[in-house]
Amino acid sequence: MTSLQLVWFKRDLRLRDHAALTAASSRGPVVALVVYEPSLWSLPDSSGRQAAFYQECLAEFKLSADRIGLRVLIASGEMPELLDHFRQAIGPFTLHSHEETGNWESFARDRRVLDWCRFHGIAWHEEPQNNVVRRLATRDDWARIWQERMKKPRLSVPRLLPLSTELEKALSSLPDAFLCHNFHPWQRLADLDLCPGRLHGGRKAGIHYLKSFLDGRGVDYRRHMSSPGTSEPSCSRVSPYLTWGALSIREAVQATRSARAEWRERHGHPLQRRMLVSLKSFESRLHWRCHFIQKLESEPGIELTCSHPATRGIRNEADLTDTEVTLLEAWKSGTTGLPFVDACMRFLQHHGWLNFRMRAMLISFASQHLWLHWRATGHHLAQLFVDYEPGIHWPQIQMQSGTTGINTIRIYNPEKQATDQDPDGAFVRRWVSESTLPGYPSPIVDHLDSAKRARELLWGLRKTTVSRLQSQVIFQKHGSRSGSRNPKSKKPPIDTQGVFDF
């Protein structure tokens, strides 16, 4: 029997620019495997709205795969146990997948799969994606590697060898308990977490949003990205399609570069200057997207522990007190008594998306003003984000909580943000219509006093010699190598980048 090439699709539901699929197709007949893993989908950073989006991506992926003759097996169960069922049914195979930089549990799962492969003599070939570098020796090389990968040609949909009669017969013998003949596992989750304003999943939708943004919809991107009321139509909205792999990051970067070249030639066009500014800004954010995912790849524990040792234990890391539970629930439900904060939370609940500045304000408010530990609030936000990307989410959560040691400490004034980003109050009126009525709650915290206490404590932690040395170590591992920053400075380095508005 010809050795089968099994491609394990995870957060990479596409056929184009798929290195693992391309590599597998050059070695022999290919079968695709997509797995609903109950243990991962039940984690506190997973949600039904994410499952709904993934299911839509998967449905479109399955149709596209059928058109090119790619057999797609959809299974429900845990890895690597499912691989054992597969091996018993068809014999030895070669496993292919993309490298994944996910949460801690997916990292542990991959280690179990690797152990299983080694024990059974199964070769597992992992291909890079998201331009994250495994076993990166130094950050000094990262930007160069990123550029090299971005310039490589995108991979086309590969031609596939037909499956032999023997393989078809072996695949048909797989037990029913192994296979899902529909998308019910994801649908069950989706039914429990309705998100009426979210985008529809699938590659076609992702291409539509990217193309419309590059063709002119992004003209006010730079001007409108900071306000929750104007960012929704002005941002690209491709983040969930990148997160779940309907689009590759290289596709997005190369399409953006092509669009920039085209707009440079549109002399006299009334949108030319603004579009060029917007597209340059957008491309830089695609770069920074990979930069932050690299942080989690290099240090998976960022999801679990404060990066800077001096900040460990400054917030309650045990079970929440009754007071903390009350504060947390008010924040989660959008009933803090601060209208702009509440409006942003309710918008996020409805849409599954929020512009970056307001995401930062929500977590900063919870961490600095309410002084809640970022793990509890980070999990809640992760569930709400359809575009939840662990490699961006957890480093950003720590950044806004002041626990990285290398980023400037951001404490947003919610009233100033309301004045700056919603000057006429239209956004608040839309999402917190009761804010001017007698029944609306009083603020759960004095935001000026709480911000002052947080600022003094966090900056105070950075003043010791030990803290400064620890910051230098963190910067060497994770900091941007921008020419304006000097890692040899006697002062603790400050990585000021922190803007993500896709």
PLM region spans:
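Trp/Phe/Arg-rich N-terminal binding region typifying the photolyase-homology
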Residues: M1-T165, Q272, R346-F347, P395-Q396, ...
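A general alpha-helix detector
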Residues: L95, R237-V238, A252, A343-C344, ...
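Glycine/tryptophan-enriched, flexible segments
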Residues: I122, D141-A310, I314, A418-F502
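Active-site-adjacent bridging/hinge elements
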Residues: M225-G229, D319, K332-L338
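Structured ligand/cofactor/substrate-binding pocket environments in proteins
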Residues: V277-Q294, M345-Q398
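C-terminal, helix-dominated tail/subdomain
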Residues: A310-D319, H369, H380-S450
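Helix-hairpin-helix/helix-loop-helix acidic hairpins
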Residues: V325-F347
